From Swiss-Prot:
Protein name as catalogued: tRNA (32-2'-O)-methyltransferase regulator THADA
List of residues that carry Phosphoserine: 1015, 1024, 1161
Coiled-coil residue spans: 886-918
Source organism, top-level taxon: Eukaryota
Function: Together with methyltransferase FTSJ1, methylates the 2'-O-ribose of nucleotides at position 32 of the anticodon loop of substrate tRNAs.
Family of the protein in this entry: Belongs to the THADA family.
PANTHER family per the UniProt record, alphabetical: THADA/DEATH RECEPTOR INTERACTING PROTEIN, THYROID ADENOMA-ASSOCIATED PROTEIN
Known disease link: Chromosomal aberrations involving THADA have been observed in benign thyroid adenomas. Translocation t(2;3)(p21;p25) and translocation t(2;7)(p21;p15); the sequences derived from chromosomes 3p25 and 7p15 do not appear to include a coding region and the fusion events probably result in truncated THADA proteins.
Key word tRNA processing present: yes
UniProt xrefs under SUPFAM superfamilies: ARM repeat
Gene: THADA
Length: 1953
């Protein structure tokens, strides 16, 4: 039951000429019942839909006539007119189809006459000679052939004429297209006409019966001659590369169709086409007509695109089914394949690549059709092992990762068809165990999961052979696929594959098993891994699985929901009961089973798998769980729970009372979400709920209105409709109350954004309709003056999103400003807006713009503005609102322009004064904002607008002239031109001359020497600095004294340029253009457009400041887009002219050029980007092609010094173009040339060229390999196979190979200075992103093998980083199975210890390669693999042969370190592979050798040299790692006893080198942490027991911060009971003194050490408290010191790490100090710790807030507090944790019986007693003056008044519940006095604020409002305690309307005192 209004069908009405109209009138009868009358009525209607009704009556009327009627002149004339009507209607008009359908039912006896009339009318059409009317005629021919009998018969009758017309029209269109070259709008239209003409020609051949015979196939037949003429035209079109490729491809189809139709005998057609494709036509054996029509195909050189389109025509137009073409057809099929394979290696243009992929997929379809016709001769040629299938597979593997989605889709079709082809060749045999399928499956599974093609191909395989064979190879595949679903780019592929697999598996299991037991196996395979991910996966994984996979699974198997719910409910119950029965389904750090349950239920309900909401709540999930989900700590759980409530598959499902209550509860705590994505989802889901309420209310309203008096027994509702409707109304009103309350003073951006978005949705969904639809709620009914003011105050937000939302909402409300504001208030708003528009704060002008627009649209402007109008608006009532807005906009713009004109005049005299007092950009911004909201295409006051536009343009140019010298100076960022009052104009002019651009690119020639006359006198400069005098008058306003900074000048100038650019761009985009000066409707003349273009050109090519030219670019883009759509040819060609002009300027630029070659060529790349990006993408992109050709040529290496500057420009422009996503795949053909230019440019001796080449190369890497998606720089997500890379860029294969060979051959040259080969870096950077794929096959054309020896030799580079890169680059080039042999080969090249001459660089490079290869090998293999162990053993033996490199015999520490790293890696690999089989290493004597290395190392003997030996830190770290491994190995062998080890942990810890100590401590810390967390198998290893004393000693003497920090961490992990008693003996400190020492460290050290020390001190404190109960008072002072330390560590300015440490401390000590039933601390200290918790819950850092919620969870889950709230043991969000913490605290105060001393402290929190209001206001003034971009206190999370609200609420509950009252009035006297003083101060400050203070003094106003609310809340509580107020007064919101709250605090009000 839907209530949505259907979209009305728009039908253009038919019309007839005057003569036909008179004819109808003459034949119409008086009664109006004959056909003429019917048609007359029809044509007189203006509504096309009504005309359809009349047309349908034509045939029934004619059926009533007898046969004599065919002689009736009335009917004859009407049939003639109907023919005319049909041919006059446009092709897409529904009337045309209706008329054709009606005439198809015409009685037979009328058909001859009707045919005659239609034929004569069509003949008239065919006789037309107007070129631009040809399209209409062509469309008519087409429509006649489509399901219209009369039309088809008419075309048959006129076939000769039709063909002649088509031939003539195509020839003339081609000629006209040639003449209109350059006018792409006309050319696009002509090419479209050409395309339609070709298609209609094909349609004729396919549908006209005459072509089925042979009568016309004679050379003298007119039809034959026309056919030959058309074929000749198609051939010409096919060869014309200036035409669109769609036109060419259609010509290819037409050529083959015509050949098929015309050629005789048909048996020879395949041979003829084959010879054309292979370019082997025997001209002597083909018919003369074919030669004359297709000579270029027979004798000429056919382009690649022409051959491609002919292949397409061959496959599409010939009949491949049933083997009708015989053997010659099969031969043609194979020849076509070979031609396509040849083309695939040649074609690189993206559009042609796309065509090729489609045609190859089409070829596989044709091959299947031929095989299905039982063609035995093709079986060998097309089976899986054939060369053709091999080539197709190569194509698939090469292109399955292609960036174009459509091309990847074609590879899927190809692969699917290949499998089908192979099945057809082995039909009859059991194809599943077929070697082809087995090998294909295994090779696909060997691939990594980051390859998209793997998913699609596996999906095809599953459909072909069944999933059971794949699961038999690896049953963990479902889990593996789910694991990768955290990567958004892979998610759609992974979910599609999973769906294919589980569907196939279910079908297979059902067919195999009769019983229902199969479902358990299916659940185990597909549902269990899903549940694990939902509970334990990372956030992205869960989100994507929920969005993509879960709906598919539940849609296919709804019965699985019960299984999932049962498992998850059991898991939640186990967790709540503290029984970890199901540890795999949820840990404390994950969303857990509750989140998984909500996700499943949400999806199930949204897709209709739950019967009703009632079933859900009653049977599947409890109320408590819903509430837990709504405030869960993890945002996705909250979203899923909300989704469960809001989403339903039935749009009219009633929203239950429970759902409404839960939604209200959710909104209370979730508006302040910090994630934009979460906010968007919340708002979207609530909008769905509102739509449900609106639509279900329609149903309820209809039920209520029904006349039946009995109670409705409808499944929709269980109560009377009126009750439900009232509930809806109350609910919506309550929601709006909550949302408006959320817009309180100081509310965060997130809260405001959410509240305003939801209110906007309410206004949209429950809009007041025109007419009769019932609306259950209207937002405007709940709007009063306070709320209207609240919305307006949202304009003051520093976030524009909030301004936009508030403005849009105000526009949606039916009540306007005039309803709520008096004229004085509106005048004040207007003045405030004008003041803000000239503020020096950039964000103020945005507020001004929204205020002005608000006043314009609300018609609330001051009456004084009407003086700006010279012409009043004349309008009827219908247009009145638009006319009023236009009038208001015009007045405001004129007012702003008048002000701006004065300010520009002032700025021309004193730019400094302008920057300090009236930066002009604000005015321009407001003008732009006002124009943007106005519909500029339908203006009424055109005569007034014209001079305004003209003046606006001149003003923009003037303003730009004033500020441009700063923007175009050499150093705009630091420039500050000074002027004096006396000589302002001349002084400024002199300075502006000085700051003209000086970076004239002469640094390309020589260093610039500062000449004597360039020097300046500092005294003279200082003398010229004069403060702006306060008495200076500007437009009658006083200007305050202000120090002008360089920043202020620059901001004024570049923002002015920005606003001018945006204004000009917008004017071009939105204003109607005047094609000729006399035009009455246009506002912008052609000359003005050209001026704007010249303006942009000048500033883009000359500006130096990025902000200026980037925004000039934005405006220029709008201009170029308009020009390219402009019908005026002179304007249309402007971008092309500008492009040629700037390219010539670049080519001719030299060091003296004005074009800026620094700053990445400044605005030049932007200029060219704008010109190219606006070129129509559907065209030939000629501008791009020519530009790229020029730039590539300029970017190449050059020896001419004069060409250096053009080269730099070209490189910078190329970088910008390759980064421009709008150019898409059109830029790809130039990537290879760009890469060559970048790599060669990197070898230039000129720094600027090298720098630009580097930037270009970086852009190319991103363009080729995609935006970096993984944190790991070397992750395969941003890599591609060598085959794919070199197939896409084949030119780079020989280039990179040659460059690499050149580098490798000279890298270790013996001649003099080592050659550092700068290009090696870029070469290796490319190569390391390639990898060999198992699917690459054995093709040697683009093999990666030749690169390997050169990369190995690059490892000999003298540059350390290059050697590392070579090692990384080598790894992907070596197949995994070849790695062991390669490692052995590399090891064999290392020198022996007896060799006399060797180079350490060579050794180092080789060892790095060994190390990286070994690492890759170990990562890719499973440890249990026997081959793996065998290979590692062989490698170990080879490694031992060169062991001298790890010993002192090798003098180089760098190579020693790498060799030791290899040894360490081998120990890790062999330990992993052997597990308990330790003798593998022992049998090789490996550990013995390692012990020898360590014993002989400097760790034992000491270091004979100074610390500054190269490679020392690296060597120490490597050696230490190996030593630690040896110690653990020895301990494992000897039963944890430290025997037979060359070195002990104690020795390592006593090393003089921090690198050694740090690594050792790291290893020990890891063991202690594992033991502390319970992850260790046996706790702390015995080797580490009793080391407390050692760590204490180390702590006292360690001076290295990192090591000291780790020692403290270890002590923290250890039980204090083990080491604390030893402090006095070891370090001569009592435990108490040790505690003081620890706290001193926590007070003074840097953050990380401070955090660890705080944790340690807290652990020591806890130990004292728990073990020394009787002597607690002995450390009372230390306890107080600790409390203060905790308090100080909570401050916002401290690092996050410090505050996280405090949270951890508070959480661990909660049972002891915060919730102890018998408090240990004094109440003041206990409450101070609680205040810390509350402060941390309001932190702006989410990590801190989330951690603090753990403290609250711990606090409310204690035995004495778990009844305080309903959320004990639950993970909650910080927003509700604040309220829960206060609830627990208030409960504890009552438990402790500490209300009397505790209440004043809590009331102090409420009032904010620490704030000094006077100082606060004074500091605000200081902030405003000093900081240009200071946005005051931008709070993203913390909201003071939310804390006040919760505290007030819980204090009231506490006081009400306990009934406590102060025993004496004096008890609260201090607070009452403070509150009274605060009231008076607030009143005073409010009086001092100016009018409209909320806009012009937002910061002060907001702070005062916040303090006012706090004071008000405190007043109410004090009144309640005194018995002056009842409960009903107190429960009012602490932020009632502004007016009410002001009354409570003003001095004249008694309540305020």
């Amino acid at each position: 039951m839907g209530v949505k209004k259907k979209k009305e069908m728009q039908v253009a009405a038919l019309t007839i000429c005057h003569q036909d109209l008179e004819t109808l009138k003459s034949f119409a009868d008086v009664e109006g019942k004959n056909l003429a009358s019917l048609l007359l009525h029809c044509v007189q209607l203006t509504d096309g839909v009504s005309q359809i009704h009349y047309i349908k009556q034509i045939v029934p009327l004619l059926e009533k006539a007898d046969k004599n009627g065919m002689c009736d002149p009335t009917i004859q004339s009407c049939l003639d007119i109907l023919a005319g009507i049909y041919l006059s209607l446009s092709l897409k008009n529904p009337l045309k189809k209706v008329l054709a359908s009606s005439l198809n039912s015409l009685p037979d006896f009328f058909l001859p006459e009707a045919m005659h009339r239609f034929t004569s009318r069509l003949q008239e059409e065919l006789n037309t000679t107007d070129l631009y009317s040809y399209r209409k005629v062509t469309d008519n021919i087409s429509s006649c052939m489509e399901n219209f009998n009369l039309g088809r018969a008419s075309v048959n009758n006129l076939l000769k004429n039709v063909l002649h017309f088509l031939q003539k029209s195509l020839i003339e269109i081609l000629e006209e297209n040639r003449k209109c070259a350059g006018n792409h709008i006309i050319q696009t239209q002509l090419m479209n006409d050409l395309l339609v003409g070709i298609r209609v020609s094909m349609m004729l051949v396919q549908k006209v019966q005459d072509f089925q015979g042979n009568l016309w196939k004679t050379s003298d037949s007119p039809i034959w001659q026309n056919m030959c003429g058309l074929l000749s035209i198609f051939t010409k079109v096919l060869s014309d590369d200036d035409l669109l490729q769609t036109v060419q491809s259609t010509s290819g189809l037409a050529i083959i169709l015509f050949i098929k139709t015309m050629f005789h005998p048909s048996e020879k057609i395949p041979h003829l086409i084959s010879s054309v494709l292979l370019r082997s036509v025997d001209c002597t054996s083909v018919p003369e007509w074919f030669m004359s029509s297709c000579r270029s195909l027979c004798c000429g050189d056919i382009s690649q695109s022409a051959v491609l389109f002919l292949c397409q025509g061959t496959l599409a137009m010939l009949d491949w089914q049933n083997g009708s073409m015989g053997r010659s057809g099969e031969a043609l099929l194979l020849d076509t394949a070979h031609v396509l394979f040849t083309l695939s290696s040649q074609i690189k243009e993206p559009t042609l690549e796309m065509f090729l992929s489609r045609i190859l997929a089409s070829w596989t379809n044709s091959a299947i059709q031929v095989l299905e016709s039982s063609s035995p001769s093709l079986t060998d040629s097309l089976n899986g092992n054939s060369s053709i299938v091999g080539r197709l597979l190569e194509y698939v593997y090469t292109h399955w990762e292609h960036p174009l989605d459509a091309l990847r889709h074609q590879t899927k079709i190809m692969f699917k068809n290949l499998l089908q082809m192979h099945r057809l060749t082995v039909e009859g045999a059991d194809f599943v165990p077929d070697p082809f399928f087995v090998e294909l499956t295994e090779s696909l599974l060997r691939l990594e999961w980051h390859i998209k093609g793997k998913y699609t191909c596996l999906g095809c395989l599953v459909e072909c052979i069944g999933v059971e064979h794949i699961l038999a190879i690896d049953k963990t595949i479902p889990s593996q696929i789910l694991e990768v679903m955290g990567d958004q780019s892979l998610v759609p592929y992974a979910s599609d594959l999973l769906e294919t697999m589980f569907r196939n598996h279910k079908s297979h299991l059902k067919s195999q098993t009769a019983e229902s037991s199969w479902i358990d196996q299916w659940h185990e395979t597909w549902v269990s891994p899903l549940l694990f991910i939902l509970c334990e996966g990372n956030l992205d994984q869960k989100s994507y699985v929920i969005d993509y996979y879960l709906p598919k699974l539940l849609s296919y198997s709804p019965e699985s929901l019960q299984y999932m719910v049962k498992i998850l409910q059991t898991s939640i119950d186990a967790k709540t009961g503290q029984e970890q029965s199901f540890p795999s389904l949820g840990s404390c750090n994950s969303r857990g089973a509750l989140g998984a349950l909500m996700a499943c239920l949400r999806i199930a309900r949204a897709h209709g798998h739950l019967q009703s909401a009632t079933d859900t709540w009653e049977n599947l999930v409890s109320d408590a769980r819903i509430k837990q989900g709504l405030i869960h700590q993890h945002c996705q759980v909250r979203i899923d729970t909300l989704g469960l409530l809001c989403e339903s598959n039935r749009s009219t499902e009633i929203v239950s009372m429970e759902e409404m209550q839960w939604i209200q509860f959710f909104i209370t705590y979730n508006l302040n979400s910090q994630s934009p994505g979460v906010r968007q989802q919340i708002c979207s889901l609530l909008k769905k709920l509102f739509c449900r309420i609106q639509e279900s209310s329609q149903v309820l309203y209809k039920l209520e209105q029904s006349k039946s008096k009995r109670e409705p027994e409808n499944e929709l509702t269980k109560q009377h409709p009126s009750v439900s409707l009232q509930q809806y109304k109350n609910f919506m009103s309550s929601i709006c109350n909550s949302l408006f309350e959320a817009l309180f003073p100081g509310s965060s951006y997130s809260t405001r954004f959410s509240a305003l978005t939801i209110l906007g949705s309410i206004a949209e969904v429950f809009h007041v309709p025109e007419g009769r639809i019932y609306t259950v709620y209207q937002l405007s009914h709940d709007i009063d003056v306070g709320r209207f003011q609240t919305l307006m105050e949202c304009f003051t937000s520093t976030f524009e999103d909030v301004k936009i939302l508030a403005f849009d909402l105000l526009m949606k409300l039916s009540k306007t400003a005039v309803h709520f504001q008096d004229s004085g208030k509106l005048q004040g708003l207007f003045q405030a807006a004008l003041e803000l528009s000239t503020s020096t704060k950039p964000y103020d002008c945005v507020t001004a713009s929204y205020l002005l627009n608000f006043l314009i649209w609300q018609d609330a402007l001051p009456s004084s503005l009407s003086a700006y109008l010279t012409q009043q608006v004349a309008c009827d009532n219908g247009d009145r609102p638009a006319a009023v807005v236009e009038r208001n906009t015009l007045m405001v713009i004129k007012c702003l322009m008048e002000n701006l004109e004065e300010e520009v005049s002032q700025a021309e005299n004193s730019l400094l004064q302008a920057a300090a007092a009236f930066p002009m950009y604000g005015r321009v911004h407001c003008i732009t904002g006002a124009l943007q909201k106005l519909s500029l295409n339908s203006l009424q006051l055109v005569s007034e607008w014209r001079p305004v536009v003209e003046k606006l343009l001149l003003m923009s140019y003037r303003l730009s002239t004033v500020v441009s010298p700063v923007i175009q100076s050499s150093s705009p960022e630091g420039l500050i031109p000074m002027d004096t009052d006396s000589e302002s104009a001349s002084r400024l002019q002199m300075i502006l001359n000085e700051i003209q651009p000086r970076d004239t690119n002469d640094y390309f020639n020589q260093a610039k020497i500062l000449k004597e006359h360039d020097s300046f006198d500092m005294k003279d400069l200082n003398a010229s600095v004069v403060n702006i005098d306060t008495s200076t008058e500007i437009k009658g306003k006083e200007v305050k004294t202000c120090d002008v900074t360089a920043q202020m000048v620059l901001v004024c100038c570049w923002r002015s340029m920005k606003e001018v650019a945006l204004l000009l761009g917008m004017l071009c985009q939105l204003l109607p253009m005047q094609p000729v000066p006399e035009s009455s409707d246009g506002l912008l003349t052609v000359e003005q457009v050209k001026e704007i273009g010249d303006y942009f050109k000048q500033h883009l090519l000359q500006s130096r400041h990025r902000g200026a030219f980037e925004l000039a670019y934005t405006g220029f883009v709008k201009l170029t887009e308009v020009l390219n759509r402009c019908p005026n040819v002179s304007l249309q060609k402007l971008p092309e002219q500008w492009l040629w002009s700037v390219l010539e300027e670049i080519k001719c630029s030299d060091p003296s050029s004005k074009l800026c070659a620094t700053r990445r060529s400044a605005g030049i790349p932007f200029y060219i980007q704008a010109l190219l990006a606006s070129e129509p993408k559907k065209g030939r992109m000629d501008l791009l092609k020519i530009t790229m050709k020029e730039l590539i040529s300029l970017a190449g290496p050059t020896d001419d010094i004069q060409s250096t500057v053009p080269q730099v420009h070209a490189l910078n422009i190329l970088r910008a173009l390759f980064r421009d996503t709008r150019l898409g795949e059109n830029i790809i053909p130039y990537v290879a040339d760009g890469a060559k230019a970048a790599i060669l440019g990197f070898t230039s001796p000129v720094w600027a060229v090298r720098n630009s080449s580097t930037l270009l190369f970086s852009a190319l890497i991103t363009r080729i390999f995609g935006v970096k998606r993984a944190k790991d720089e070397h992750s395969k997500t941003n890599r591609m196979t060598g085959r794919e890379f070199f197939s896409r860029f084949p030119e780079l294969y020989p280039f990179l190979l040659k460059q690499l060979e050149t580098v490798a051959n000279t890298v270790d040259s013996d001649m003099g200075e080592p050659n550092r080969h700068p290009s090696m870096f870029l070469l290796l950077l490319v190569l390391e992103r390639l990898y060999a794929s198992p699917m690459d096959g054995t093709s040697s054309a683009l093999s990666m093998g030749p690169f390997v020896p050169f990369i190995m030799r690059c490892g000999h580079s003298p540059v350390y980083h290059s050697r590392e890169m070579a090692a990384r680059a080598l790894v992907p080039f070596v197949m995994i199975d070849h790695i062991p042999n390669t490692i052995r080969t590399l090891l064999s090249t290392l020198p022996s210890c007896t060799d006399q001459c060797f180079r350490q660089n060579h050794i180092h490079g080789t060892l790095l390669q060994v190390f990286h290869l070994l690492q890759a090998y170990s990562d890719s293999k499973h440890g249990t693999n026997s081959d793996f162990q065998h290979e590692l053993t062989d490698i170990t033996v080879c490694t031992k042969a060169k062991l001298w490199l790890a010993k002192r015999q090798n003098p180089c520490l760098v190579t020693r370190a790498v060799y030791i790293d290899i040894l360490f890696l081998l120990t890790c690999c062999l330990n992993r592979s052997a597990k308990d089989n330790q003798p593998v290493l022992e049998s090789l004597g490996f550990w013995e050798e390692v012990r020898g290395i360590i014993s002989g190392s400097e760790l034992i003997t000491g270091f004979p040299w100074a610390f500054k030996v190269p490679g020392l830190p690296q060597y120490l770290q490597s050696l230490t790692r190996l030593a630690i491994a040896a110690v653990w190995a020895a301990a494992a062998k000897s039963g944890e006893r430290e025997t037979n080890v060359p070195i002990s942990f104690s020795q390592l810890l006593e090393s003089a080198f921090p690198e050694v100590r740090s690594l050792t401590l790291e290893a020990l810390l890891e063991k202690f942490l594992a033991a502390a967390s319970g992850l260790g198998e046996k706790g702390v290893p015995p080797l580490l027991c009793n080391m407390g004393e050692k760590f204490l000693l180390l702590a006292m003497k360690e001076n290295h911060p990192e090591c000291f920090c780790k020692i403290l961490k270890i002590l923290h992990c250890m039980d204090p009971g083990e080491w604390l008693p030893q402090t006095e003996h070891c370090v001569h400190l009592t435990p108490k003194e040790f505690l003081i020492w620890t706290m001193d460290i926590a007070s003074n050290e840097r953050s990380e050490i401070q955090s660890v020390a705080l944790r340690l001190a807290s652990k020591v404190i806890s130990h004292h408290m728990q073990t020394c109960v009787e002597n607690r008072e002995l450390i009372a002072a230390e306890l107080k010191q600790w409390v203060q330390l905790v308090i100080l560590s909570c401050e916002d300015h401290l690092p996050t790490e410090s505050r996280l440490a405090v949270v951890e401390v508070l959480t661990s000590t909660t049972p002891l100090f915060l919730t102890n039933p018998h408090p240990i601390l004094e109440l003041q200290d206990t409450l101070a710790l609680w205040k810390c918790v509350l402060t941390l819950l309001q932190s702006e850092e989410q990590a801190v807030r989330d951690a603090a919620t753990e403290t609250v969870t711990t606090a409310m889950s204690q035995e004495n507090t778990c009844q305080s709230t309903e959320f004990a043991f639950c993970q909650v969000d910080a927003s509700i944790a604040l309220a829960l913490a206060l609830a627990v605290l208030c409960d504890l105060l009552q438990q402790w019986d500490q209300l009397a001393p505790g209440l004043p402290i809590l009331l102090g929190w409420l009032l904010g007693e620490s704030d000094d209001l006077v100082a606060c206001v004074e500091s605000m003034h200081q902030v405003e003056e000093d900081y240009l971009f200071e946005k005051a206190e931008v709070n993203f999370w913390a909201e003071t008044l939310i804390f006040v609200k919760y505290l007030c609420k819980h204090l009231f509950c506490l006081l009400s519940k306990s009934g406590w009252r102060p025993p004496s009035p004096e008890m609260l006297c201090h607070l009452q006095r403070m509150v009274s003083e605060q009231c008076h101060l607030l009143s005073q400050f409010f009086r001092e604020l100016p009018p409209a203070a909320e806009f012009v003094k937002t910061v002060e106003f907001t702070r005062l409002r916040i303090q006012e609310e706090r004071t008000l809340a405190c007043l109410r509580l004090l009144a309640f305690l005194e018995g002056k107020e009842g409960e009903d007064t107190l429960v009012l919101s602490v932020w009632d309307s502004y007016a009410e709250s002001r009354q409570l605090t003003l001095p004249r009000t008694e309540a305020a005192c």
